[in-house]
Regions:
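Eukaryotic intrinsically disordered, low-complexity regulatory linkers and tails enriched in Ser/Thr/Pro
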Residues: 1-136
Protein backbone atom coordinates (compact mmCIF):
# COMPACT_ATOMS: atom_id res chain seq x y z
CA UNK A 1 0.00 0.00 0.00
CA UNK A 2 1.32 3.43 -0.93
CA UNK A 3 0.81 6.50 1.23
CA UNK A 4 0.83 9.98 -0.30
CA UNK A 5 1.79 13.12 1.61
CA UNK A 6 2.17 16.74 0.59
CA UNK A 7 5.88 16.10 -0.04
CA UNK A 8 5.87 12.67 -1.71
CA UNK A 9 4.66 9.10 -1.37
CA UNK A 10 6.06 5.80 -0.09
CA UNK A 11 5.34 2.08 0.05
CA UNK A 12 4.21 1.22 3.58
CA UNK A 13 5.30 -2.41 3.14
CA UNK A 14 8.94 -1.27 2.87
CA UNK A 15 8.88 0.80 6.09
CA UNK A 16 10.72 -0.43 9.19
CA UNK A 17 9.64 2.43 11.42
CA UNK A 18 8.43 6.02 11.41
CA UNK A 19 9.49 8.66 13.92
CA UNK A 20 7.22 11.71 14.11
CA UNK A 21 8.34 14.92 15.82
CA UNK A 22 6.64 18.28 15.25
CA UNK A 23 4.72 17.35 12.06
CA UNK A 24 7.77 15.86 10.37
CA UNK A 25 8.37 12.15 10.03
CA UNK A 26 11.63 10.36 9.48
CA UNK A 27 10.79 7.13 7.72
CA UNK A 28 13.30 4.27 7.72
CA UNK A 29 13.02 1.90 4.75
CA UNK A 30 14.16 -1.67 4.02
CA UNK A 31 15.02 -1.15 0.36
CA UNK A 32 17.64 1.60 0.27
CA UNK A 33 21.31 1.09 0.92
CA UNK A 34 22.51 1.68 4.48
CA UNK A 35 23.94 5.12 3.72
CA UNK A 36 20.59 6.37 2.47
CA UNK A 37 17.69 4.40 3.88
CA UNK A 38 15.52 7.12 5.39
CA UNK A 39 13.56 10.09 4.12
CA UNK A 40 11.72 13.02 5.69
CA UNK A 41 8.00 13.52 4.98
CA UNK A 42 5.46 15.94 6.39
CA UNK A 43 3.06 13.78 8.45
CA UNK A 44 1.19 14.54 11.66
CA UNK A 45 0.57 12.06 14.43
CA UNK A 46 -3.17 12.62 14.11
CA UNK A 47 -3.28 11.92 10.37
CA UNK A 48 -1.19 8.75 10.69
CA UNK A 49 -3.32 7.54 13.64
CA UNK A 50 -6.42 8.06 11.50
CA UNK A 51 -4.82 6.16 8.63
CA UNK A 52 -3.92 3.23 10.92
CA UNK A 53 -7.45 3.14 12.33
CA UNK A 54 -9.02 3.02 8.86
CA UNK A 55 -6.64 0.44 7.37
CA UNK A 56 -5.52 -3.00 8.43
CA UNK A 57 -1.84 -2.38 9.12
CA UNK A 58 0.56 -4.19 11.38
CA UNK A 59 2.14 -1.20 13.15
CA UNK A 60 2.48 -0.51 16.86
CA UNK A 61 2.64 2.99 18.31
CA UNK A 62 5.02 3.99 21.10
CA UNK A 63 5.31 7.53 22.51
CA UNK A 64 8.03 9.05 24.62
CA UNK A 65 7.93 12.43 26.32
CA UNK A 66 11.04 14.50 25.78
CA UNK A 67 12.70 15.24 29.12
CA UNK A 68 13.88 18.76 28.35
CA UNK A 69 10.91 20.16 26.44
CA UNK A 70 7.15 19.90 26.47
CA UNK A 71 7.07 17.76 23.32
CA UNK A 72 6.88 14.09 22.53
CA UNK A 73 8.32 11.77 19.94
CA UNK A 74 6.04 9.13 18.43
CA UNK A 75 7.38 5.87 17.02
CA UNK A 76 5.32 3.71 14.65
CA UNK A 77 6.97 0.32 14.25
CA UNK A 78 6.20 -2.21 11.52
CA UNK A 79 5.68 -5.51 13.37
CA UNK A 80 6.65 -7.51 10.28
CA UNK A 81 10.17 -6.03 10.32
CA UNK A 82 10.96 -6.67 14.02
CA UNK A 83 13.66 -9.24 14.79
CA UNK A 84 13.80 -8.63 18.57
CA UNK A 85 11.71 -6.56 21.02
CA UNK A 86 13.03 -6.06 24.56
CA UNK A 87 10.96 -4.41 27.29
CA UNK A 88 13.63 -3.63 29.89
CA UNK A 89 11.77 -2.26 32.89
CA UNK A 90 14.92 -0.59 34.21
CA UNK A 91 16.01 1.29 31.11
CA UNK A 92 13.83 1.43 28.02
CA UNK A 93 12.54 -0.45 25.01
CA UNK A 94 15.03 -1.82 22.51
CA UNK A 95 13.83 -2.95 19.09
CA UNK A 96 16.13 -4.67 16.62
CA UNK A 97 15.01 -4.97 13.01
CA UNK A 98 15.56 -7.62 10.39
CA UNK A 99 18.39 -6.82 8.00
CA UNK A 100 17.56 -6.25 4.40
CA UNK A 101 19.61 -7.49 1.49
CA UNK A 102 21.17 -4.01 1.13
CA UNK A 103 22.37 -3.58 4.71
CA UNK A 104 25.60 -4.54 6.43
CA UNK A 105 24.12 -4.31 9.92
CA UNK A 106 20.70 -4.24 11.52
CA UNK A 107 18.89 -1.12 12.69
CA UNK A 108 18.20 -0.69 16.38
CA UNK A 109 15.61 1.66 17.83
CA UNK A 110 15.65 2.80 21.47
CA UNK A 111 12.48 4.22 23.01
CA UNK A 112 12.62 5.88 26.42
CA UNK A 113 9.42 4.24 27.64
CA UNK A 114 8.56 1.59 30.18
CA UNK A 115 5.65 -0.73 29.40
CA UNK A 116 3.66 -2.40 32.14
CA UNK A 117 2.97 -6.14 31.84
CA UNK A 118 -0.46 -5.68 30.21
CA UNK A 119 0.86 -3.21 27.61
CA UNK A 120 3.73 -5.56 26.80
CA UNK A 121 1.39 -8.55 26.40
CA UNK A 122 -0.84 -6.52 24.06
CA UNK A 123 2.15 -5.57 21.90
CA UNK A 124 3.41 -9.16 21.94
CA UNK A 125 -0.01 -10.36 20.76
CA UNK A 126 -0.04 -7.84 17.90
CA UNK A 127 3.50 -8.79 16.83
CA UNK A 128 2.66 -12.50 17.05
CA UNK A 129 -0.50 -12.11 14.95
CA UNK A 130 -0.38 -14.49 11.98
CA UNK A 131 2.99 -15.90 13.05
CA UNK A 132 4.10 -18.99 14.88
CA UNK A 133 4.79 -17.74 18.41
CA UNK A 134 5.79 -19.82 21.44
CA UNK A 135 6.25 -18.53 24.99
CA UNK A 136 8.97 -20.23 27.00
Amino acid sequence: MYIGTSTGFFDLDEVKFIIIKDHFAEIKFMTFNYNHNSEIFEITEESFDEFLKENDTNFIKLSQKNKFSNTKTVFYVNCDKIACFINDKTYNITIKFKKSYFEDKEDTLYVDLKLNDLEFEMIKAKIAKDKKFVNI
